[in-house]
C-alpha cells in the first residue's frame, strides 16, 4: 500500500514564492519607502483636516491619509467607469506587475484575490444623497459596477486577463490576509500557478469614525499626540487609529518563478483560516481559535513552533484584542519567544487592506533580516508575555515568520512565510 505524502509545503504541496509587491500607505506611496521610514521610527498618523471632523464634531481627529490620489494615473474612460477602490486596485496592480518584472504568464492559470473590509459603503451613501436631491437620473448606469464589493478584484482581473478565478474575501480586518491565504490555497491545490492578491480599503470618512467611536473601547482619542496615539501591547493602550492603505503581492509556484528568472523575495509556506464563534466584535479572550490558526499555518508550512523567529502581530492597540493575541501566540508557539512587531503603531489600521500591508512587511523583514521597532511601547503590559521589538530596529537571523490578522465577526487568519 502506497502512503500519500503529507499535506504540507515541500511534500504534497508545491513551493510557493513572493515575486512582486506594491503598496501605498500613510507613510509613502511605495513599499520600499514605507519600509525605510518604519525602520527609521517614523509615523504616518497626523491630525485630520477633513471638513467632516468639525461638521459632526467627531471625538477622533487623528488618522493617516494616503499621500497620493489615483485619478491622474488613469484615463478619462477609466475614471468614469471606476469607483475609488477600483482605481486604487488598478493602479496598484500595474505597479505590482512592473515590480515583478512585467512577466508573461498563462492567463488561464492566473487568479486574483483581493479583499476589502468596508468597501464602497460611503460612496453608496453619497449616491443616495444625489438621488434624493436630483432624482433617479442622478444615478449613473455604471453605479452597480463601480460600487459592488467585488469591483476592486474584478477590475484587476480584467486588467490582467486573469481566468483562474477572481475572489473578494470580505472578513473585516482579516480581509487582506484572507485574500492571500485563499490565493495560496488555490495554487497549492493546483487550481492556479500565480495570483495577484492582497487588500484595498476606502478613505477615512465620517461614518466609520462615528461608528467605531460610539463603541468607546476600540478607537484612541489621543488627539493631542497623533503619532503617539496607538500603543500596541502597552499597559496604557486605549485603541486603534485609522490609517489608509492598499497592498498587493504576486505569488506563484517556485517552478514558475525560476523559469522566468524572477526576483524571489520570500516563500509563502502555509496559511490557515479559523473563526472564534464567540462574539460579533470582541475576540475570544483566551485566543483559542486564533492560536489554532497560527499553529495550523506553521504545520502546513512543514515547520515546528520552535522554527518561528518573527511574528507580525495584528495588535490594534485595544485592551482586550492585544491580550487575546498574546495568549494565541503563546498557545501556538509553546515555549518559543519570537521577535514580535506591531506595525499599526506607525501606519494605523487600514481594515480590509491591513493584512496585506503587514504580509508585505513580513516579507521585507525576512528579505532584509531586520525588524522595525514598535512605536509608543513605553510600559509593556505585565499580562503580555511577548518579546516585542521596540526602541530601535532589531537585526537577526530570521528564517521563518508568521503574520496574524483578526477581524470583527471572529475572523482569524495566519500566514507562514520563509526567507529565500
From Swiss-Prot:
SMART domains: PKS_KS. It comes from Mycobacterium leprae (strain TN). Its main location: cytoplasm. Its EC number is 2.3.1.294. Residues 13-419 form the Ketosynthase family 3 (KS3) domain. Pfam families: ketoacyl-synt (PF00109), Ketoacyl-synt_C (PF02801). GO terms for molecular function: 3-oxoacyl-[acyl-carrier-protein] synthase activity. It is an enzyme of class 2 (transferase). Pathway: Lipid metabolism; mycolic acid biosynthesis. PROSITE patterns: KS3_2 (PS52004). It catalyses: an ultra-long-chain di-unsaturated fatty acyl-[ACP] + malonyl-[ACP] + H(+) = a 3-oxo-ultra-long-chain di-unsaturated fatty acyl-[ACP] + holo-[ACP] + CO2. The gene is kasB. GO terms for biological process: fatty acid biosynthetic process. Belongs to the thiolase-like superfamily. Beta-ketoacyl-ACP synthases family. This is 3-oxoacyl-[acyl-carrier-protein] synthase 2. It is found in: Cytoplasm. The lineage of its organism: Bacteria, Bacillati, Actinomycetota, Actinomycetes, Mycobacteriales. The active site is at 173 (for beta-ketoacyl synthase activity), 314 (for beta-ketoacyl synthase activity), 349 (for beta-ketoacyl synthase activity). Part of the mycobacterial fatty acid elongation system FAS-II, which is involved in mycolic acid biosynthesis. Catalyzes the elongation of long chain acyl-ACP substrates by the addition of two carbons from malonyl-ACP to an acyl acceptor. Involved in extension of the mycolate chains to full lengths and produces longer chain multiunsaturated hydrocarbons averaging 54 carbons in length. One of its GO terms (cellular component) is cytosol. Keywords: Acyltransferase, Cytoplasm, Fatty acid biosynthesis, Fatty acid metabolism, Lipid biosynthesis, Lipid metabolism, Transferase. Gene3D superfamilies: 3.40.47.10.
Amino acid at each position: 500500500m502506497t502512503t500519500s505524502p503529507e499535506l504540507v509545503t515541500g511534500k504534497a504541496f508545491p513551493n510557493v514564492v513572493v515575486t512582486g509587491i506594491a503598496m501605498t500607505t500613510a507613510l509613502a506611496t511605495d513599499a520600499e519607502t514605507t519600509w525605510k521610514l518604519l525602520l527609521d521610527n517614523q509615523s504616518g498618523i497626523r491630525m485630520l483636516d477633513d471638513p467632516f471632523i468639525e461638521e459632526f464634531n467627531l471625538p477622533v481627529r487623528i488618522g493617516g491619509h494616503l499621500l497620493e490620489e489615483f485619478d491622474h494615473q488613469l484615463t478619462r474612460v477609466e475614471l468614469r467607469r471606476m469607483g475609488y477602490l477600483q482605481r486604487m486596485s488598478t493602479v496598484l496592480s500595474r505597479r505590482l506587475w512592473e515590480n515583478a518584472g512585467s512577466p508573461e504568464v498563462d492567463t488561464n492559470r492566473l487568479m486574483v484575490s483581493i479583499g476589502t473590509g468596508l468597501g464602497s459603503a460611503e460612496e453608496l451613501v453619497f449616491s443616495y444623497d444625489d438621488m434624493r436631491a436630483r432624482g433617479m437620473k442622478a444615478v449613473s448606469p455604471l453605479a452597480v459596477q463601480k460600487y459592488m464589493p467585488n469591483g476592486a478584484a474584478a477590475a484587476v482581473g480584467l486588467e490582467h486577463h486573469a481566468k483562474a478565478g477572481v475572489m473578494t474575501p470580505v472578513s473585516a480586518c482579516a480581509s487582506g490576509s484572507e485574500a492571500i491565504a485563499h490565493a495560496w490555497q488555490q495554487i497549492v491545490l493546483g487550481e492556479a500557478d500565480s495570483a495577484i492578491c492582497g487588500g484595498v480599503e476606502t478613505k477615512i470618512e465620517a461614518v466609520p469614525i462615528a461608528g467605531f467611536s460610539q463603541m468607546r473601547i476600540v478607537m484612541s482619542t489621543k488627539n493631542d499626540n497623533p503619532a503617539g496615539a496607538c500603543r500596541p501591547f502597552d499597559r496604557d493602550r486605549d485603541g486603534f487609529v485609522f490609517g489608509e492603505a492598499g497592498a498587493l503581492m504576486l505569488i506563484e509556484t517556485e517552478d514558475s518563478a525560476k523559469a522566468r528568472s524572477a526576483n524571489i523575495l520570500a516563500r509563502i509556506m502555509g496559511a490557515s483560516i479559523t473563526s472564534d464563534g464567540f462574539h460579533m466584535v470582541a475576540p475570544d479572550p483566551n485566543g483559542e481559535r486564533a492560536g489554532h490558526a497560527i499553529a495550523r499555518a506553521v504545520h502546513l508550512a512543514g515547520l515546528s513552533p520552535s522554527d518561528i523567529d518573527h511574528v507580525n502581530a495584528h495588535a490594534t492597540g485595544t485592551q482586550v484584542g492585544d491580550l487575546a493575541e498574546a495568549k494565541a501566540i503563546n498557545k501556538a508557539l509553546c515555549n518559543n519567544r519570537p521577535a514580535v512587531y506591531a506595525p499599526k503603531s506607525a501606519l494605523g489600521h487600514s481594515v480590509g487592506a491591513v493584512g496585506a500591508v503587514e504580509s508585505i512587511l513580513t516579507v521585507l523583514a525576512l528579505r532584509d533580516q531586520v525588524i522595525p521597532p514598535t512605536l509608543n511601547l513605553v510600559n509593556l503590559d505585565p499580562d503580555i508575555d511577548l518579546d516585542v521589538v521596540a526602541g530601535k530596529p532589531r537585526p537577526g537571523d530570521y528564517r521563518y515568520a508568521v503574520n496574524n490578522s483578526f477581524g470583527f465577526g471572529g475572523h482569524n487568519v495566519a500566514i507562514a512565510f520563509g526567507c529565500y
